[in-house]
Amino acid sequence: MSRRCELTAKGAQVGHKVSHSNIKTKRRFLPNLVNVTFLSDTLGRAVRLRVSTNALKSVDHRGGLDAYLLKAREAELSPKAVELKRAIAKKMAGEPVAAAS
């Protein structure tokens, strides 16, 4: 399982740990990821995603998962999130949606 947010595509970054004597050693800055169950009002079901706490704050600010996904670019979403976005858009357009596995 990769350390990447499924909504914002935030991943691990590489930098230096700097000691008091200014010796630099490589280290990784990992994103703060949490497993969250969102409720989709449009689809009427729960969706489980692994997201960063920053994305969690953004989803809350936008007014829910549906609003966040519809506004987000597909390039920065995971394949699972893109599938959800398309299902939400299709449902809002009035077309029947097949159940996602």
UniProtKB/Swiss-Prot annotation:
The keyword Ribosomal protein applies. It holds the Pfam family Ribosomal_L28. It comes from the Bacteria. Keywords: Ribonucleoprotein, Ribosomal protein. GO terms for cellular component: cytosolic large ribosomal subunit. Belongs to the bacterial ribosomal protein bL28 family. HAMAP family: Ribosomal_bL28 (MF_00373). The initiator methionine may be removed. This is Large ribosomal subunit protein bL28. The lineage of its organism: Bacteria, Pseudomonadati, Pseudomonadota, Alphaproteobacteria, Hyphomicrobiales. The gene is rpmB.
